Amino acid sequence: MYHQEQHPVGAPPPQGYPPKDGYPPAGYPPAGYPPPGYAQGYPAQGYPPPQYSQAPQQKQNAGMLEGCLAALCCCCLLDACF
C-alpha cells in the first residue's frame, strides 16, 4: 500500500507587489556606496572622463614564431633519426 502525506494547498504569495516595508529595504544600498577605492560612476557633467593608461602588450607573435621554429626543428630531428 502506498501512503503519501497530503499537505494543505494554498494560494502562493502575490507576485509583482512591493514588500510590506517598501522598496528598497531600509539601509540599501549602504551609505557611502560604492565603497572607497571603487569606481565612482559617471563623471560630473562638463568634465571629461578620467584617462587610463593601456596595459603593456605582450609579445604574441614571438610566441607563435618560437612554436613554429620548435615544430620545424622537431620535424628535422625526426627526419634525421628515421
UniProtKB/Swiss-Prot annotation:
Subcellular location: Cell membrane
TM region positions: 59-76
GO biological process: megasporogenesis
UniProt region (Disordered), positions on chain: 1-58
Superkingdom of the source species: Eukaryota
UniProt GO cellular component terms: plasma membrane
Annotated membrane topology: Single-pass membrane protein
Stored Pfam families: CYSTM
Pro residues bias (residue ranges): 26-37
Induction trigger: Induced by heat in roots.
Keyword field: Cell membrane, Membrane, Transmembrane, Transmembrane helix
Reported phenotype of the disruption mutant: No visible phenotype under normal growth conditions, but flowers of the double mutants wih1-1 and wih2-1 have defect in megasporgogenesis. Doubl mutant plants display retarded growth, and twisted leaves, siliques and roots.
GO molecular function annotation: protein homodimerization activity
Cell membrane in keyword set: yes
Tissue and organ expression note: Expressed in root meristem, root vasculature, leaf vasculature and floral organ primordia. Mostly expressed in roots and flowers and, to a lower extent, in stems, siliques and leaves.
Self-association state and partner proteins as the record states: Homodimer and heterodimers. Interacts with CYSTM7, CYTSM3, CYTSM4, CYTSM5, CYTSM6, CYTSM9, CYTSM10 and CYTSM11. Binds weakly to CYSTM1 and CYSTM2.
Record-stated family: Belongs to the CYSTM1 family.
Function: Required for the promotion of megasporogenesis, or promotion of germ cell formation from somatic precursor cells. Acts redundantly with WIH2. Functions in a genetic pathway downstream of SPL/NZZ and WUS and together with TRN2 in promoting megasporogenesis. Involved in resistance to abiotic stress.
Protein name: Protein CYSTEINE-RICH TRANSMEMBRANE MODULE 13
Gene: WIH1
